[in-house]
């Protein structure tokens, strides 16, 4: 990340995103921490703005808010939705300005809209073969997001593209040219059930059930 020839490390933790610099002798030291990003479930690094250093997209699954917008303390800081949820944690694009100095460029790059969808994973790849890295985000509880890199440090939302807005419960992503036509194809793994009856964790969804039922099923 600091372009000094060795591999650095970036981790998602409950204390935020933490970047460790490699001193070149096998020792890593904490360089910078982002405490406002405590719910990262996935990350992807690439030089999206082609300035010579790696930038990072962070998928934040949880939000600090519940449905009423209040701050919660303890585990499970938000309810578990069923479908098409938009109250997850906001995803963040961290632009590397050199020397391990990262700046939140989400708004500037056009990635700040419709980006709170309980995102599990992201993938950078040049899907349109124009020489820059595009971005796809796998979202739990709803449609995925796809952004085309405009080559000028910004992105255009193409989430309505066929096969992207599939409404599944996105868990993972991988790309390869499986049909050898020179274009990257995409596989999105999902955890999905079409069952009409579901067991939900929210206590208000099963308030009318007796104690034995709650202990057995929940």
Regions inferred by a protein language model and the residue ranges of each:
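Acidic, glycine/proline-rich Ca2+-coordinating loop motifs
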Residues: 1-218
């Amino acid at each position: 990340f600091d372009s000094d020839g060795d591999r650095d490390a970036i981790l998602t933790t409950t204390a935020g995103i933490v970047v460790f610099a490699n001193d070149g002798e096998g020792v890593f030291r904490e360089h910078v921490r982002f405490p406002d990003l405590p719910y990262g479930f996935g990350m992807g690094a690439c030089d999206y703005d082609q300035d010579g250093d790696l930038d990072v997209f962070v998928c934040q699954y949880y939000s600090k808010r519940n449905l009423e917008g209040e701050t919660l303390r303890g585990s499970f800081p938000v309810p578990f939705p069923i479908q098409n949820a938009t109250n997850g944690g906001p995803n963040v694009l961290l632009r590397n300005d050199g020397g391990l100095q990262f700046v939140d460029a989400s708004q500037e790059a056009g990635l700040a809209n419709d980006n709170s969808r309980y995102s599990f994973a992201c993938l950078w790849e040049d899907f349109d073969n124009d020489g820059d890295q595009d971005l796809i985000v796998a979202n739990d509880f709803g449609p995925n997001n796809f952004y085309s890199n405009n080559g000028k440090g910004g992105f255009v939302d193409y989430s309505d593209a066929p096969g992207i807005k599939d409404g599944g419960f996105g868990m993972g992503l991988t790309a390869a040219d499986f049909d050898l036509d020179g274009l990257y194809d995409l596989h999105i793994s999902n955890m999905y059930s079409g069952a009409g009856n579901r067991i939900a964790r929210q206590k208000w969804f099963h308030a009318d059930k007796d104690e034995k039922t709650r202990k057995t099923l929940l």
